Amino acid sequence: DYLPGGARQGLRELLSAATIRYARETGDADAARAFTRAFITEFEAYGPGAFTELVRGYAAGDDIDLAWRARCALAARGLVDADGITAWRDADGSGEAQRHAARALASLPDADSRAGAWESVFSGALSNDILSATLAGLAASSWEGDAGTGAAIDRMEEFWQSHTIGMSLRYVRGVLAVGLDIDRPGTVAQTLDALRAWLDSHEGAPAQLRRVVVEHCDSYE
């Protein structure tokens, strides 16, 4: 069963505090890292509060994996800007930094950043990993305006026909994760309605594509 919306915030704060406590108290480095990752994931999803400075500390830390997770979380909540993200990317210089930065830039919760991210997705010029990272960033963002998935859903068959199966699957699955938020139940219904409409109007679409869409519809019902 799901908790009522009004009861969730208190539980989230308890969960965040518990994961940090366990990360600090465990003597196992792998367990500490796992608890810290869980804490950062919770922060990315539900936002600023008493733990913001702690996340900023991880973002500036020496553990590159945790640092980029924290940077992406800060970006998704609008607590860092594009200049800060590109500075981190350029200072790192690795391929992983390129991927993380693409995710962080796409997750910035402002209209211009989202428009730029969607434009790059539609351009067809992204690598598999950067495409997935960009779509993951769009999905992770705290942006509460139009998710932009309408046009992306409309383009699914076109994208499928013009790209490899692997990239097409990344596109479709990534697009269908954008804009869903259990704290806003209407987003699930809107996506489900859009997918049903797409199925009705694309009866001749490739069978594998239709199957992926049907599977997502089933999971949302």
Where are these regions (language model features)?
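Long, ordered, helix-rich scaffold segments
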Residues: 1-221
